[in-house]
């Protein structure tokens, strides 16, 4: 037993299972990129990256160049695509560390081209096109049309012709692939496919075409192309309740846990926590547990959420504090200081998922797992071995 106040258990065997299961949904020639940005969605970027690469992934996706450099510093040599913007003055790092940089506009690509030619180098890039996400990328959208606007094709061709850049890939990102209604996703894919055809017709084919995120990987096999980008699904969480979960069995990789710090009997009419917003309706037993909003437990769960104690669901009562939270354990016998408490995960056959917490907060599981803060140790389990990252 560890002595942590709160900790996240990461099942690396579950990550391995998920990556292999997702790769099995694709054609053999289709590569899988594991998205490990945001510290591996809170699970640990380097730890997840290593397991993903051993389990069927052949490339990694990060948001920022410093994440890519961290992976390189940990000895990871696989292709890494930086999905976000990087200032052109960091060109030397891109080249020296063999990174692939996303470019999203002609002006951005021109700046990177000038920086690369100034040092006599070539930077590998993937061109991103916006087909309906409204975020990064060359805008291809003409409202009411599924064909890309002509200016977008010209801009893309201009990027591909720049010196100092090796345009290895072109990609887009779906806004609604996790919806049961695929109308918007289909329109995006049509724009993307047409743009690719026009690039090819102009004599500028691109080797690596990718569009599918986790949701499209599961639900839209026609979008798999040369590579898929798996994010939330490699961590065992489905992109939404609307994707077809029958197509792949995922295993949640993270459990978030804490311990009982104090147990106290209280009478009816007893007020709990800041603001005295909760009053006990009858005599009961409170357990004070060593987790709070500084650990990533959202304060909006105050008097709304549940945790598991001895395999029983018990309610959070009163406002969540920075470091502590109170539970009503009056219905659970023999609760004691030091008992394990599960915020999400399994205990004695009971389960609370990150999705359940997300639903209570009117958000998504992505936010739940990435919100767990750096002061929470990650405890890694892989087969019979375990390791801790503080």
Swiss-Prot record:
Pathway: Amino-acid biosynthesis; D-alanine biosynthesis; D-alanine from L-alanine: step 1/1
Catalytic activity field: L-alanine = D-alanine
Binding site for substrate: 135, 322
Gene Ontology BP terms: D-alanine biosynthetic process; peptidoglycan biosynthetic process
Listed cofactors: pyridoxal 5'-phosphate
Pfam families: Ala_racemase_C (PF00842), Ala_racemase_N (PF01168)
Keywords associated with the record: Isomerase, Pyridoxal phosphate
This enzyme's EC code(s): 5.1.1.1
HAMAP family, per the entry: Ala_racemase (MF_01201)
Protein name: Alanine racemase
UniProt organism field: Desulfosudis oleivorans (strain DSM 6200 / JCM 39069 / Hxd3)
Organism placement in taxonomy: Bacteria, Pseudomonadati, Thermodesulfobacteriota, Desulfobacteria, Desulfobacterales
């Amino acid at each position: 037993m560890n002595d942590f106040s709160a900790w996240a258990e990461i099942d690396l065997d579950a990550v391995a299972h998920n990556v292999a299961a997702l790769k099995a949904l694709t054609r053999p020639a289709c590569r899988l990129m594991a998205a490990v940005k945001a510290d591996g969605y809170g699970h640990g970027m380097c730890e997840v990256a290593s397991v993903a690469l051993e389990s069927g992934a052949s490339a990694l996706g990060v948001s920022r160049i410093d994440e890519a450099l961290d992976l390189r510093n940990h000895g990871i040599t696989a292709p890494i695509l930086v999905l976000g913007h990087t200032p052109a003055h960091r060109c030397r790092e891109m080249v020296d560390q063999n990174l692939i940089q996303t470019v999203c506009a002609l002006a951005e690509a021109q700046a990177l081209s000038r920086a690369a030619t100034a040092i006599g180098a070539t930077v590998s890039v993937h061109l991103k096109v916006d087909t309906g996400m409204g975020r990064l990328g060359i805008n291809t959208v003409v409202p009411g049309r599924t064909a890309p606007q002509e200016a977008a094709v010209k801009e893309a061709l201009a990027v591909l012709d720049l010196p100092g850049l090796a345009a290895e890939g072109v990609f887009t990102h779906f806004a609604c692939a996790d919806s049961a209604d695929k109308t918007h996703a289909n329109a995006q894919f049509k724009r993307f496919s047409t743009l690719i055809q026009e690039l090819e017709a102009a004599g500028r084919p691109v080797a690596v075409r990718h569009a599918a995120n986790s949701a499209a990987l599961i639900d839209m096999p026609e979008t798999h192309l040369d590579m898929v980008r798996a994010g939330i699904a490699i961590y065992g969480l489905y992109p939404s309740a609307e994707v077809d979960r029958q197509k792949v069995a995922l295993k949640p990789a993270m459990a978030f846990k804490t311990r009982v710090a104090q147990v106290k009997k209280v009478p009816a009419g007893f007020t709990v926590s800041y603001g005295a917003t909760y009053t006990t309706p009858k005599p009961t037993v409170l357990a004070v547990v060593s987790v709070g909003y500084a650990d990533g437990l959202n304060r909006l769960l105050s008097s709304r959420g549940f945790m598991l104690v001895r395999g029983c669901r018990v309610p959070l009562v009163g406002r969540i504090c920075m470091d502590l939270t109170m539970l009503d354990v009056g219905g659970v016998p023999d609760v004691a200081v030091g008992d394990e408490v599960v915020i999400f995960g399994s205990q004695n056959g009971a389960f609370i998922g990150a999705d359940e917490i997300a639903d209570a907060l009117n958000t998504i599981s992505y936010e739940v797992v990435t919100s767990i803060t750096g002061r929470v140790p990650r405890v890694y389990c892989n087969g019979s071995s375990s390791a801790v990252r503080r």
